[in-house]
A protein has these predicted regions:
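Active-site catalytic motif of lipid deacylating hydrolases and related acyltransferases
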Residues: 40
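Active-site pocket-lining/capping segments in soluble small-molecule metabolic enzymes
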Residues: 1-36, 45-273
Length: 273
């Protein structure tokens, strides 16, 4: 909320804001989304709201929340991060368009520790893996069928072709500048690392303070010893920012060619890493 209030006073070149969370319902619950939507709309921002990946315990709550936003703020765009929510919203509001969040666009290539595996594959398999998901004709057909006209994607060199392809298919492509989502899970990474799982539901302070994981050593099982990682290994294991149940990497190998990208997203969660 503080960041939004500052932005409302001095927006610079920013034209819109993205609220909510890609994957953590607890983060969403604690981040004053209704109040921020109201403030952002009042200040003339283009507003997008990420509805997190919906786990079973939160299904009814976030169905209701997504519908509430749509009906109270028809100018706000809902970004869903799982296919179940997209199917539900399209069935409820068949004439409305939606966005696909990073929970939908997340691909094999987004994982920094997979890149050396990817590059070791034969070229035809590399291309197949890089195209998986966002350049898959069946995926694109489903997105169009569900009324999706915009997609959020990570900033990744291996996705350059996907940006252009998605744009050519008629989608608005938004890219998180300098940021790649590395993992998305059900369990909360953040509370696990600070050993505070009993504080689930009252835990947002741990995310806002920021937790950075830096891999410096590895366990040598044969010799029962810890050893420093090599520079080569470190180059493919960059520092990661933990945010609830996702981890993000800043500038692994950002894209150099943004052909087809309509909007660059500046994510405050990684700005200080």
């Amino acid at each position: 909320m503080d960041s939004l209030e500052k932005l409302a006073k001095d927006r610079g070149n920013f034209t819109g804001v993205i609220l909510g969370h890609e994957n953590c319902p607890q983060y969403y619950r604690q981040s004053y989304v209704p109040e921020m939507v109201s403030l952002a709309v009042e200040n003339g921002f283009d507003v997008k709201v990420n509805i997190p990946v919906i786990f079973e315990d939160f299904l009814d709550e976030f169905k209701e929340e997504a519908c509430r936003i749509i009906e109270e703020y028809p100018q706000v765009k809902i970004f869903a991060n799982d296919w179940g929510m997209l199917y539900y919203l399209h069935g409820r509001y068949p004439e409305r368009t939606f966005g696909a969040g990073k929970g939908i666009s997340f691909t094999y290539a987004d994982n920094p520790w997979n890149e050396h595996i990817l590059l070791a594959e034969k070229e035809k398999y590399q291309e197949a893996l890089k195209a998986a998901n966002m350049q898959n004709p069946d995926t694109i057909d489903q997105m169009k069928l569900l009324g999706i006209d915009e997609i959020e994607m990570s900033d990744l060199e291996l996705s350059e072709g996907a940006y252009k392809h998605m744009n050519d298919e008629g989608f608005i492509v938004s890219v998180n500048k300098g940021m790649t989502v590395a993992t998305m899970s059900r369990a909360c990474h953040c509370l696990r690392f600070v050993d505070k799982l009993d504080e689930m539901g009252n835990c947002m302070d741990y995310c806002t303070k920021g937790i950075v994981l830096s891999i410096k050593d590895y366990y040598d099982m044969a010799n029962n010893d810890h050893k420093p990682v090599s520079p080569e290994t470190k180059s493919i294991q960059p520092d990661m920012c933990v945010d609830g149940n996702i981890t993000m990497v800043k500038n692994i190998q950002p894209a150099g060619d943004y052909t087809g990208v309509s909007c660059m997203i500046h994510d405050e969660r990684i700005m200080d890493i």
